[in-house]
């Protein structure tokens, strides 16, 4: 059965099968890998608030609702007390709103932190607002060209594709967002039910205490013990007097008073607990109402039907626009004449333009709706964190109440019960005393019976000893003469005396030593007998004789004083078949010994060669004499063989043999059964080992499968996120390409117009240049003719008189100079460039200079590579020589030629400065191409944009660091300890002064020296001595010292503490928060001068709240 796991942080859901997880630990590990929540921070709840534990993990299939709610325990860290209606009346609305806003802000920060740690994408950041189509700004009614129409329609189709992707994305995440919101609402409701179950347990514990107290009240005997004491115990006599002597009346009266006070104490505690439980119940009810209100809030302003209608309308209009655009673009270019464009294309494009505006309006409405939905989800998440914090706060309070009930109330109720039991025992004293007398009588009876049994045992021992003595005498009488060669006097009975002494001895050591000696002798004799029988076998004596000795030795070995005990066993106590077989074997041996004893009870029936020698007479006939028979019987009785007396008939013998046969068959059957069961047990054990091996292999395979499933799940999620990122990147690139395409189209149109204007201007300039060249050729030809004429005149004049030569030469040179100057001025004024071109050239150089100046002001330098290409590089320290006042928008930029460091700029400026003195057009084209290089491939724009992005990133980082440092500064500011110029809410160190209030002389000077102008850098040894002295003085009895705030840095003002609540008692120092400061002036020494300060002294009376003490 699959279960839906709901994430309480994001609302995501996944389907899992709990059967693939071995335990709860593996399930939590899977959720941790899936959602990035630490395993230790995961809390799992079933429906109705049931907590998922190891004990109920395997019983999840019993639940009706297959859902598991996953909580991050860090969501409960923002504990805050919920506000009820009573709180709203008690506190001001402004304070409540401020607290709520503060908590919501902290919840938003916690949500961002958790989502960032889990790397959960923020959909608000992924939304891109739809941008207008380039077709909207086109003035179609004024007329358009075929090229413009095709370009705009193609661009509009790209815009329409991007817009459809955005709208489909809005629709997809809209449904998911609604599902997530519903999942979050169910998670919040389940957590509230969990709190209800927890509170129900505490209420049940409280009710059990109340019921127990009521039972104690109903069965209370504290009011009847006096009557019982006076009317019964004082009149009922026992062995040693009246029973009232066993009851201390004074102590019972004391306990009665204690019980009454304890009853009131327990009642007051339970009432207080009831009051707090009701308060928490009201807060829970308030949380329930708020949760219901949150669930009832609609996700969007418009209904789903309206959204679907908008989606359908958008799709319909988009299909119409695409079809109309394709109809135009698919037609042959030859059809696009001016008339066709005017009659056919323009109306269609106007209609497309209107529908494009409608599409933009619909898409923006969907965007706004999606943005509102995501904002609502985020606000809902914040509210969930706030409510979870309130639930955690109530649970903490309920937990404290539970501990209080379990510890304090239970202790009081236990004491209450013990006191009631003591009062109840007073009424039970007559019965208990009667039982005591009966028990004492029973012990007397037992003692009497025990004495009788001990006397009987003593008599039994004497009888057994006498019987043993008789047996020995009879044996000696029959065999004593034959045993004389063994050199042992068998007529002595020292061993019986030793046993008697041992019984009368109190030494445990002697008893143990006696028994150990007997065991040693027994082992020694046993070894001798075994060796003796072995030697008889080796010597080849009669087998019958050896068998008699072996059987006799076996009987003697098995004989003991307790052989009369019945050998039947209680089979109900036998737990092992081997023990049962062993007991049957023992019984068989016992029966065999009885048969053997019966067969050899008569000496005459012994085999030949046993005590039958030729040199000795036979003392007994075939039938044993009565004395010998009695001797055998006594011997058998002493050795514990009394059961043989019952086997006197052949019938009994037959029964015993039959029983031995049956028991042998049972033993054989049991041995076979035992062997069969042993084989079955071995087979079962081997199967169990195989099962364990298979189980281990299955567990290992399942672990590998779980790891592989987790890895595949993570990979799937990564691929999904990567696909989303690629889709968003594609949309952004499409948008940027659309914008760039539009800009390029606009630039192309502008350049086309400029090119046409330049072509016209160029043709005009070429015609003027041709005219100027013709005029220049004419002037050169005229000048050459004039020079030839002048030369001829000069040669003619040279022949004149010598006295007129110098004057004629001067006049001629003057004429030549004038003609030459006229020619040069004509050439200069005939420059090939018009004033408009010169003006454009100047403006172009100014724009270029300003751009280079802007680059260097933002730390970028224009350089040239070895290949002749321009580069813009980031150079540190470049702005040190530039103006630092450019942040002022009203400031004017100073001349920039002297502050630009770029070598490229200086080369281009040199080219520009040579243009007025050079009429070559190639130099002008070289200047224009050099300037154009900086704007090729968006070099200038890319450098500026990237630089501003770096500046923006740096600004964000610095803003974040500034915010954190501001928080630290505020924290340190709040914890700062003031030492001068005190104000309200400052923290100050308060110390006692050196003098008491009762001493008036030199008090002010000592106070001033104690707290003014303190050098904080001095060593602390002297301060320690002063503190020690002040401690000694503070410990003096009946001395009241005034307290003052510690001051430093030449602070001459005196700040005395207003100690109304005696907070300084038994303290050496404390840190307090100043709550009030009152300025005082000593106007009269005798009045209003509690500290005996000089006249006109300004001092301050401080009220402070204690923050920290020693």
Curated annotation (Swiss-Prot):
**Molecular function terms from GO:** molecular adaptor activity; protein kinase binding; SNARE binding
GO BP terms in the entry: autophagy of mitochondrion; cellular response to nitrogen starvation; cytoplasm to vacuole targeting by the Cvt pathway; pexophagy; piecemeal microautophagy of the nucleus; positive regulation of autophagosome assembly; protein localization to phagophore assembly site; protein-containing complex localization
Tell me the InterPro entries matching this sequence. Answer: ATG11, Atg11_C, ATG17-like_dom
Its membrane topology, per UniProt?
Peripheral membrane protein
Q: What is its main location?
A: membrane
GO cellular-component terms in the record? Atg1/ULK1 kinase complex; phagophore assembly site membrane; vacuolar membrane
> Which keywords fit this entry according to its UniProt record?
Autophagy, Coiled coil, Membrane, Protein transport, Transport, Vacuole, Virulence
| Tree of life domain | Eukaryota
Compartments in which it is found: Preautophagosomal structure membrane; Vacuole membrane
Q: Does the keyword Protein transport apply?
A: yes
Any Pfam family from its record, for instance, is ATG17_like
The UniProt entry's coiled-coil ranges are: 264-309, 651-803
The UniProt family comment states: Belongs to the ATG11 family.
Assembly and binders: Homodimer.
Sorted alphabetically, which PANTHER family does this protein's record hold?
A: RB1-INDUCIBLE COILED-COIL, RB1-INDUCIBLE COILED-COIL PROTEIN 1
Quote the function comment for this protein. Involved in cytoplasm to vacuole transport (Cvt), pexophagy, mitophagy and nucleophagy. Recruits mitochondria for their selective degradation via autophagy (mitophagy) during starvation. Works as scaffold proteins that recruit ATG proteins to the pre-autophagosome (PAS), the site of vesicle/autophagosome formation. Required for the Cvt vesicles completion. Contributes through its regulation of pexophagy to survival during engulfment by host phagocytic cells during infection.
Q: What is this protein called?
A: Autophagy-related protein 11
Which species is the source of this protein? Answer: Candida glabrata (strain ATCC 2001 / BCRC 20586 / JCM 3761 / NBRC 0622 / NRRL Y-65 / CBS 138) (Yeast)
Task: List the gene name.
Answer: ATG11
